[in-house]
Amino acid sequence: MARYLGPKLKLSRREGTDLFLKSGVRAIDSKCKLETAPGQHGARKPRLSEYGTQLREKQKVRRIYGVLEKQFRNYYKDAARLKGNTGENLLQLLETRLDNVVYRMGFGATRAESRQLVSHKSVMVNGRVVNIPSFKVSANDVVSIREKSRTQARIKAALEVAAQREKPTWVEVDSAKMEGAFKRVPERSDLSAEINEQLIVELYSK
């Protein structure tokens, strides 16, 4: 399955919430009718079944993190094997992806841009180049931008945007050095309250 390359705002409208797929610090609802689904009949909101509600939540989270269906299912299987709450485990596994950590540190304006930085070998973990977006970052790992990539205008622009956002407490970033430390795996309370991971657990438990 190929990645979605179409309009990003359309995906946010489909889910009825900002998926943070566009760069910038302003919420997108000022220019995008989030309450209306895309398409000719977008104004008509069908009443979702229990399954439909669970599916929409899974699609929403999958799109937020930019993960394909097969990858997402594998993350769920891994989360189910771990001790504790499966839904929380799932979100924590997604948060430890290298492309997501690069985004959280502000080196990429979006997760998609952060994924591209990783794929193009612009990112190092503990001094070694890593070009696998799904690479799992561990507590106390140091993530940095390669020296030859530090002049990229998009990275500088992303850092300027990130400076206006609320900084995640689980990462520590030195913007001047373009380097950050992943201090810990975030707790559930650190993450968006708009995600209902229990719906995803119910979906995959069927």
Swiss-Prot record:
Residues annotated as signal peptide: none
Molecular function GO terms recorded: rRNA binding; structural constituent of ribosome
Keyword Metal-binding: no
SUPFAM superfamilies on file: Alpha-L RNA-binding motif (SSF55174)
Gene3D superfamilies in the record: Ribosomal Protein S4 Delta 41, Chain A, domain 1, RNA-binding S4 domain
GO biological process: ribosomal small subunit biogenesis; translation
Highest taxon above the source species: Bacteria
GO CC entries: small ribosomal subunit
Domain S4 RNA-binding stretches: 96-156
Alphabetical UniProt keywords: Ribonucleoprotein, Ribosomal protein, RNA-binding, rRNA-binding
Annotated Pfam families: Ribosomal_S4, S4
Family: Belongs to the universal ribosomal protein uS4 family.
Protein role: One of the primary rRNA binding proteins, it binds directly to 16S rRNA where it nucleates assembly of the body of the 30S subunit.
Subunit note: Part of the 30S ribosomal subunit. Contacts protein S5. The interaction surface between S4 and S5 is involved in control of translational fidelity.
PANTHER family in the record: 30S 40S RIBOSOMAL PROTEIN, SMALL RIBOSOMAL SUBUNIT PROTEIN US4M
Name assigned to this protein: Small ribosomal subunit protein uS4
